[in-house]
Amino acid sequence: MVKIRLKRAGRKKMPVYQIVVADSRSPRDGKFLEVVGHYQPTLKPHSITLKKDRVEYWMHCGAQPTATVNSLIRATGLLYELRMKKLGRSEADIATEMEKWEAAQMARREKRVTLKARRRRAKKEAEAASASSAEG
């Protein structure tokens, strides 16, 4: 069986992964058929690059993505796009839907960042209040 999976590269404690198409019997960092992308988890935000046409080709040929790679493909919106193609939508419809999807993803990311900043601010205020009450 052919799998789309991660191949580790990079140095110690600084991983960089190649997204490769490989036979499921080959070892993690062993022989592979093709490199279809890269994933850098240490960057903020994470960097995911895919050759969308090649991923689509291999999935059409029957390659199964692993759970981690499936979530990375979903994060780029490729699975949503492939689903719409499978349903027979026109290219224009797919393009407008993908623009809406990207806008929703950006809004979700911004909301997450603002919530994180608000929590951090509240934590600092609570620490400052407890420190001032401990002094007095």
Swiss-Prot record:
UniProt key word Ribosomal protein: yes
Disulfide bonds: none
SUPFAM superfamilies recorded: Ribosomal protein S16
Gene Ontology molecular function terms on file: structural constituent of ribosome
Superkingdom as given in the UniProt entry: Bacteria
Record has Ribonucleoprotein as a keyword: yes
Keywords, ordered alphabetically: Ribonucleoprotein, Ribosomal protein
A GO CC term attached to the entry: small ribosomal subunit
Biased segments, Basic residues type: 114-123
GO terms, biological process: translation
Region annotated Disordered, chain positions: 114-136
InterPro entries xref list: Ribosomal_bS16, Ribosomal_bS16_CS, Ribosomal_bS16_dom_sf
Pfam family, one: Ribosomal_S16
Family statement: Belongs to the bacterial ribosomal protein bS16 family.
NCBIfam families from the UniProt entry: S16
Name of the protein: Small ribosomal subunit protein bS16
